């Protein structure tokens, strides 16, 4: 592949949805592009606005909060696995709307109870495990559960 073909192909890849730097590097490696050419392509993509890790972090967080109703812990882990710096993650994690976050926990509890019946002593551990797997902390779950009971 020529440099122009590579650039054209990777621009389409980035235009389809927001991509972080690591995703683009992985794609370029899968095409067996040399290290020096990878750096040049990445620089062009960043200059042209095809790659922007800050924009990626913002859209990732909003997508996981709104669509998947994930908790902060799972979002952080997902971003760290994509090679995003902890400082950048922390910068945008604090922008999460606390009311929406609490509503997401309540909605997850409601959905779980529709599938598994009311929360009882026997199945409360399963509920907590489910919510913690979605990335919520024990304290967050407990505070929402107490509000729901009162």
Please identify what each model-predicted range represents.
Residues 1-150:
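An alpha-helical, amphipathic repeat domain used for nucleic-acid recognition
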